Regions:
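Long, well-ordered core segments of solenoidal/helical folds
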Residues: 111-143, 166-187, 228-249, 288-313, ...
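Short proline/glycine-enriched turn/loop motifs at strand-loop junctions of beta-rich domains
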Residues: 385-390
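Structural beta-strand segments of beta-rich domains
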Residues: 377-381
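Well-ordered alpha-helical segments within folded domains of soluble proteins
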Residues: 80-87, 101, 143-159, 201-219, ...
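Carbohydrate-binding/catalytic loop surfaces
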Residues: 122-141, 184-203, 247-269, 310-332, ...
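Glycine-centered tight-turn motifs at strand-turn-strand junctions
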Residues: 402-427
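Low-complexity, Ser/Thr/Pro/Gly-enriched N-terminal "stalk/linker" regions
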Residues: 30-148, 159-190, 308
Length: 462
């Protein structure tokens, strides 16, 4: 775009001189940085929160800061990390009135834990007396609410004996209390930083499982008239595109993404389980929107699921990152597909479930790709395998002496290679490749590699 021309001072010297002389320097005040304290004050002054909430949250904030000063080492770092995360949300303008309860509950629980409770292992889950909520330890970010873990627990109560009804009720009410408005609907958000995604974010896996568990609980506890409107509000996330919601339109229907901050990453196990959740919500409540959202996702999943079958194992994700499942996620995907197969009797899901079950007892297929190398230099020894496995390579000389032994570790499917400093002595060497897949199925091959004499170096002239 061409720069706009303006009259120069030379052409209107008198006017410019007058204006420059008359104009006093203007000092612009820097815009105040958004902090927890300022955002609380703003919400209170604008009538978004009442006096009791304002006073209680200010007290929690002050207690956390005071406790941080009294702690040392890992305890101090964890509590400070939680506070920094909430401060970051405040700085980004995300500290809405509707989020204050779950966020200040997070601050309060972390202050309680790190003041007196044991240090934790990464991923360890804990609870507090008088509450059914599940908290998960995230190194550097302290204890965090974990929606999926909580909804898994709620599902267990809802499907279990009526002796669990009291605990089912407590957890259900606690989970409803931490739900927040999002995109015109209702969501259970994550407040931790994960894979570069800053909070707050949502997940189709957690949301779908959550609505399933709430619908089951509502039916079991005879609370459907009360909870159906909330369930319907929760469906809104499946109608909204990221980063607000989880819906990504495809040629076949709609894919529901696992992470709202990363819509190009397609994780199949989360998508499949979100469909199981939507299917159950539609069946339990009779809600037509839930049925339509399932149908939209079902059309996409029927096209997508076969693409995650490598012929020997399952893929965990595609598009932004394509990689194979580890054993846990392979089995989890198989189980989710079993659920979808049982509900829909759809050939695509039932076939994939059968394949993934079979792969758990099928050893990897190996093939030696390198058959000839020149001696006297470092060369590449290539081999291929059919599925992610722990592999090792051993080469023996014609004399029987081992000349290479490499533990390659866990490697993915496809063609792989190891570096080999090839001996100068020509002859037929033997390569042995051993591989054990993640389910413990072993395989091995042996094959010859011909080592050629090194090329003679040309003598320099004269």
């Amino acid at each position: 775009m061409a720069r706009r021309r303006t009259p120069s001072c030379a052409s209107i010297a008198v006017a410019c001189a007058f204006l420059l002389a008359a104009r006093a320097p203007v000092a612009y005040a820097a815009k105040p940085r958004k902090t927890i304290a300022r955002e609380l004050e703003k919400r209170y002054q604008r009538g978004k929160i009442d006096q009791a909430t304002y006073d209680a949250d200010r007290a929690v904030h002050a207690d956390v800061k005071r406790t941080i000063r009294s702690l040392r080492g890992a305890r101090r770092a964890e509590l400070a990390g939680v506070l920094a995360s909430v401060e970051g949300m405040a700085a980004r303008g995300a500290l809405r009135a509707s989020r204050l309860y779950p966020l200040f509950l997070t601050l309060q629980r972390n202050r309680e834990w790190w003041s007196s409770q044991p240090l934790l292992a990464a991923g360890q889950r804990v609870g507090f007396a008088g509450s059914e909520l599940v908290w998960q330890y995230v190194p550097g970010q302290g204890l965090q609410l974990h929606p999926l873990a909580n909804f898994g627990k709620l599902n267990a109560y809802a499907k279990g004996s009526r002796r669990n009804n009291a605990r089912n009720t407590v957890l259900l009410d606690e989970l409803m209390s931490i739900a927040v408005p999002r995109g015109g609907g209702l969501a259970w958000e994550y407040y931790l930083t994960f894979d570069g995604g800053r909070p707050p974010w949502v997940s189709s896996l957690a949301q779908g499982t959550g609505l399933q568990a709430i619908a089951r609980s509502a039916e079991k506890l005879d609370r459907m008239p009360e909870l159906l409107p909330r369930i319907q509000d929760g469906l809104k996330l499946f109608e909204q595109s990221p980063p607000t919601g989880v819906r990504v339109e495809t040629e076949d229907g709609a894919h529901y993404v696992q992470y709202s901050f990363w819509p190009s990453l397609r994780i199949i196990n989360g998508f499949v389980q979100s469909l199981v959740g939507l299917y159950d919500v539609a069946q339990i409540t009779g809600d037509k929107r839930a049925a339509k959202l399932f149908a939209d996702g079902d059309r996409a999943a029927r096209a997508e699921v076969p693409r995650y079958d490598t012929g020997a194992w399952s893929l965990y994700s595609r598009d932004a990152i394509t990689r194979e499942s580890d054993l846990h996620y392979h089995t989890l995907l198989r189980d989710f597909l079993t659920s979808l197969c049982d509900r829909t009797d759809t050939d695509v899901y039932c076939t994939a479930e059968s394949h993934f079950t079979g792969y758990l007892t099928t050893p990897p297929h190996l093939r030696l790709r390198t058959t000839r190398v020149r001696g006297g230099a470092t060369r590449t020894l290539r081999f291929s395998l059919s599925k992610i496995s722990r592999a090792s390579v051993r080469v023996t000389a014609p004399s029987g002496r081992t000349v290479l032994a490499v533990a390659a570790g866990v490697v993915g499917r496809g063609t792989r290679s190891v570096a080999w400093r090839v001996p100068r002595r020509a002859g037929d060497y033997t390569v042995r490749i051993d591989a054990t897949d993640l389910a413990g199925n072993p395989a091995s091959i042996e094959g010859p590699v011909q080592v050629l004499k090194p090329k003679r170096r040309k003598r320099a002239a004269g």
